[in-house]
């Protein structure tokens, strides 16, 4: 965190699951090509090139030998205890985390690892692997007690009865650990500690030279004499082991083990031999063991015993009750501790607190089988219910007995699958190999792993199982809601569409076959491809059933569902809501999901054609041009069914494209019309503004004309001038002047009144004030004064009728035109110049 960053701000941490593996791959490639190697190791006259940092990180011996060396090209000669045949696999393990062992080199590898103090190996697997590789050859456990992780072995020269019991124990151990021979390292390893009494726990803390021979023999004989008691205790624990919760320290949960009556229940190793684990949250999260939640009732009891054993590494030989077999679960993470760092000897059972909608589900687990590593961080707090029993026998809770198909053997991933997992949380495959040593973790909210789902998923990609590709989901558990299985055809499944964690597809799994669902009317197609996000398979997939008993579509949802929705009740409520119309989503002609004419064909639910397998992706059918498409068709030998399907797909694609183009043309037309409408609206607003401006100008002109007319009328003194005025501007009529309109005015008067503004026209009258008229002559305004804004009418006088020389009366209507205004302006401008001369 930076200095200026607020501590309360949210922090986002990205943790890569492949970064460590990629670094190891890069370092190993550099070592093979002798790039950046800075140390040469000489072992039995054989040179090994390596990096100092890698050696110092893996071995305490190299840490002490290489730290402080400043030479550029350092040469280190290892002592005689280190052999080339034992050091080669260890060097390869340092760079690849994989150790290759055989019966010929296991002893030398063990000696070299002990000498070089590579505790990640000696603490985890040497005892187990040595037992597996040597017990078939020698018939007994051959392992010296010269390291902290080695277990005391039984003497080969015991009595015949004891030897039979020993062989029986070995046979059961070998049968239960059969899968571990296939996965040597660094796969998860599960084994059980041999039955050792407390006296041998003392010897485990002492060097081999300090342990007397008679003490070893007595302790080994004591172990054999105590075998029946341990056997009885095992049978008792098998019945009552699941009544108490199990706890782990430092975030490492104790694991389950399953013991048959022929196997002895062996206590864990002393806590003094177990390396302390740093109490960090990262280490707790990196470990892939199952952390069991629940009511921790006796957490104060057993950890107390552990602390007492740690304080007293060499206790007196007092009778101690073994706490149960401990199954080691090794984490593959680089910074994870060794197997023995998880808690030993405190496992008695698990108390599951099941959810309300689910019953207690069994967890069938073999002692020699490691747990699956695909556990997310949230799963570390999930409760589990163990179930003791054989691997091939199904065990189901009482509540769900009627909903499960019985008798399906469990199958787990083989060595190749385990090597590819690398503990990643995005495991997206539910295909398991035919190994009988491992199985996926079964949480309490999933159905039993012995249902028909595991039987179907054990086959390589069944035809009825479709898994949506290209989607990464937050968990790796396989959930089987196999109720009402009788309604389906054999090999068909109906998973719950509302399961909390849906099924995922593994990106490293083999590519799925190109699978397609088609009906007789060719109305619905779903084509599954590996990683084809743009293909129709990116939508939820529907499979129509041909069985008359099942009317709904089998739906495999690849969406992330709410964690709280689970159980049979939710499954039964959601299942009837699935409609067959959802299959049209893959053929929808546009992005909004509407139907086109080509996609609205009828599709009966009962009619379902066979699968159509194509030798090329479905995207090429729709994307390729016509010539390339024809060439591709000619290159492959296709059946009539395939050709019909291909042409139908291409036809639908062309129809969809044509419909999209048609909609695009319509949208373009609509946009063009909208643009035209906007232009017309703008032009209308512009014209209206011009009209208002012209009206304002015309009003100003009328005001000026009225004022000028009033001034002219005030200057009139004689009747001749009045007659001349009304001749050119008939505005006012004197009532008592009968001959005014007959006698023409003098020529001088005409010339003097010709440039008057009244000659512009009679459309705008000029109203004279009463005082301006000659005495005895009343003046009456004519009809032309109606449109004068500044004119005044004389009260009680009748209007006269005069002819007008101006524009017609229609021009003075409410809708004043532009032409009239221009005419008025031109006349006013033309007559104004002579008036200036006259003035």
Swiss-Prot record:
Residues 670-677 are annotated as: Leucine-zipper. GO terms for cellular component: cytosol; nucleoplasm; nucleus; RNA polymerase II transcription regulator complex. Residues 650-666 are annotated as: Basic motif. The modification Phosphoserine is found at residues 314, 520. GO terms for biological process: import into nucleus; negative regulation of transcription by RNA polymerase II; primary adaptive immune response involving T cells and B cells; regulation of DNA-templated transcription. A motif (Nuclear export signal) lies at residues 819-839. There is a cross-link at residues 381, 420 (Glycyl lysine isopeptide (Lys-Gly) (interchain with G-Cter in SUMO2)). Keywords: Activator, Cytoplasm, Disulfide bond, DNA-binding, Isopeptide bond, Nucleus, Phosphoprotein, Repressor, Transcription, Transcription regulation, Ubl conjugation. Residues 247-263, 583-597, 781-790 have a biased composition (Polar residues). Residues 150-170, 247-331, 582-609, 778-813 are annotated as: Disordered. Residues 645-708 form the bZIP domain. Detected in brain and spleen. The keyword DNA-binding applies. Residues 37-103 form the BTB domain. SUPFAM superfamilies: A DNA-binding domain in eukaryotic transcription factors, Leucine zipper domain, POZ domain. Pfam families: BTB, bZIP_Maf. Residues 321-331 have a biased composition (Low complexity). One of its GO terms (molecular function) is DNA-binding transcription repressor activity, RNA polymerase II-specific. InterPro entries: BTB/POZ_dom, bZIP, bZIP_BACH, bZIP_Maf, bZIP_sf, SKP1/BTB/POZ_sf, TF_DNA-bd_sf, ZnFinger_BTB_dom_contain. Residues 161-170 have a biased composition (Acidic residues). The reversible disulfide bond may provide a mechanism to regulate the activity in oxidative stress responses. Phosphorylation at Ser-520 downstream of the PI-3K pathway promotes nuclear export. Transcriptional regulator that acts as a repressor or activator. Binds to Maf recognition elements (MARE). Plays an important role in coordinating transcription activation and repression by MAFK. Induces apoptosis in response to oxidative stress through repression of the antiapoptotic factor HMOX1. Positively regulates the nuclear import of actin. Is a key regulator of adaptive immunity, crucial for the maintenance of regulatory T-cell function and B-cell maturation. Homodimer; disulfide-linked. Heterodimer of BACH2 and Maf-related transcription factors. This is Transcription regulator protein BACH2. It comes from Mus musculus.
């Amino acid at each position: 965190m930076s200095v200026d960053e607020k501590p309360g701000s949210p922090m986002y941490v990205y943790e890569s699951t492949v970064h460590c593996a990629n670094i190891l791959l890069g370092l190993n490639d550099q070592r093979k090509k002798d790039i950046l190697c800075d140390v040469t190791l000489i072992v039995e006259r054989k040179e090994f090139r390596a990096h100092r940092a890698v050696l110092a990180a893996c071995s305490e011996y190299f840490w002490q030998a290489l730290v402080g060396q400043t030479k550029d090209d350092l040469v280190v000669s290892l002592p005689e205890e280190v052999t080339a045949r034992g050091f080669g696999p260890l060097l390869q393990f340092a760079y690849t985390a994989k150790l290759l062992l055989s019966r010929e080199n296991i002893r030398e590898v063990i000696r070299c690892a002990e000498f070089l103090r590579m505790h990640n190996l000696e603490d985890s697997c040497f005892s187990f692997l040595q037992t597996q590789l040597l017990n078939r050859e020698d018939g007994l456990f051959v392992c010296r007690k010269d390291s902290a992780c080695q277990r005391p072995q039984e003497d080969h020269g015991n009595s015949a009865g004891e030897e039979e019991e020993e062989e029986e124990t070995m046979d059961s151990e070998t049968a239960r650990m059969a899968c571990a021979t296939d996965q040597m390292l660094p796969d998860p390893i599960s084994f059980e500690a041999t039955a050792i009494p407390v006296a041998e726990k003392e010897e485990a803390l002492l060097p081999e030279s300090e342990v007397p021979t008679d003490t070893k023999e007595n302790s080994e004989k004591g172990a054999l004499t105590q075998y029946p008691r341990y056997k009885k205790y095992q049978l008792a624990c098998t019945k009552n082991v699941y009544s108490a919760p199990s706890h782990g320290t430092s975030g490492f949960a104790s694991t389950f083990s399953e013991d048959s009556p022929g196997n002895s229940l062996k206590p864990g190793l002393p806590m003094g031999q177990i390396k302390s684990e740093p109490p960090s949250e990262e280490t707790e999260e990196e470990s892939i063991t199952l952390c069991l939640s629940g009511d921790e009732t006796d957490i104060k009891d057993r950890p107390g015993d552990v602390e007492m054993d740690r304080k007293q590494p060499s206790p007196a030989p007092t009778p101690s009750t073994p706490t149960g077999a401990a199954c080691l679960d090794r984490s593959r993470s680089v910074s994870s501790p060794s197997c023995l760092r998880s808690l030993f000897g405190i496992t008695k059972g698990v108390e599951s607190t099941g959810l309300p909608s689910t019953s207690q589900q069994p967890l069938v687990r073999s002692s020699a089988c490691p747990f699956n590593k695909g556990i997310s961080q949230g799963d570390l707090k999930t409760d589990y219910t163990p179930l003791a029993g054989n691997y091939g026998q199904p065990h189901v809770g009482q509540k769900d007995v009627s909903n499960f198909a019985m008798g399906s053997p469990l199958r787990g991933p083989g060595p190749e699958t385990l090597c590819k997992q690398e503990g990643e949380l995005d495991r997206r495959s539910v295909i398991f190999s035919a190994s009988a040593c491992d199985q996926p973790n079964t949480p309490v909210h999933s159905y039993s792993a012995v249902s028909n789902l595991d039987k179907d998923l054990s086959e390589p990609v069944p035809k009825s199982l479709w898994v949506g590709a290209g989607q990464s989901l937050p968990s790796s558990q396989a959930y089987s809601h196999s109720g009402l299985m009788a309604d389906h055809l054999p090999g068909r499944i109906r998973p719950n569409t509302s399961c909390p964690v849906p099924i995922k597809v593994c990106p490293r799994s083999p590519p799925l076959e190109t699978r397609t669902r088609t009906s007789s009317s060719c109305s619905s197609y779903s084509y599954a491809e590996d990683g084809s996000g743009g293909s129709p398979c990116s939508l939820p997939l529907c499979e129509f059933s041909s069985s008359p008993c099942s009317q709904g579509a089998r739906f495999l949802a690849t969406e992330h569902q709410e964690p709280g929705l689970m159980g049979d009740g939710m499954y039964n409520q959601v299942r009837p809501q699935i409609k067959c119309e959802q299959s049209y989503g893959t053929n929808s002609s546009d992005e909004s999901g509407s139907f086109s004419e080509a996609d609205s064909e009828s599709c009966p639910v009962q009619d379902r054609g066979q699968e159509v397998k194509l030798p090329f992706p479905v995207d090429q059918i729709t994307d390729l041009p016509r010539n390339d498409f024809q060439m591709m068709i000619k290159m492959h030998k296709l059946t009539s069914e395939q050709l019909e399907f291909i042409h139908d797909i291409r036809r639908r694609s062309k129809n969809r494209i044509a419909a999209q183009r048609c909609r695009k043309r319509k949208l373009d037309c609509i946009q063009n019309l909208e643009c035209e409408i906007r232009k017309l609206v703008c032009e209308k607003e512009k014209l209206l503004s011009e009209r208002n401006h012209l009206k304002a100008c015309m009003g100003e002109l009328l005001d000026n004309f009225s004022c000028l007319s009033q001034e002219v009328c005030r200057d009139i003194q004689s009747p001749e001038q009045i007659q001349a005025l009304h001749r050119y501007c008939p505005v006012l009529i004197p009532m008592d002047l009968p001959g005014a309109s007959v006698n023409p005015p003098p020529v001088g008067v005409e010339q003097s009144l010709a440039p008057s503004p009244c000659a512009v026209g009679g459309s705008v009258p000029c109203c004279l004030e009463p005082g301006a008229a000659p005495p005895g002559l009343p003046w009456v305004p004519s009809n032309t004064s109606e449109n004068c804004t500044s004119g005044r009418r004389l009260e009680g006088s009748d209007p006269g009728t005069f002819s007008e020389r101006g524009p017609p009366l229609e021009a003075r209507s409410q809708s004043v035109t532009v032409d009239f205004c221009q005419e008025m302006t031109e006349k006013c401008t033309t007559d104004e110049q002579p008036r200036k001369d006259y003035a």
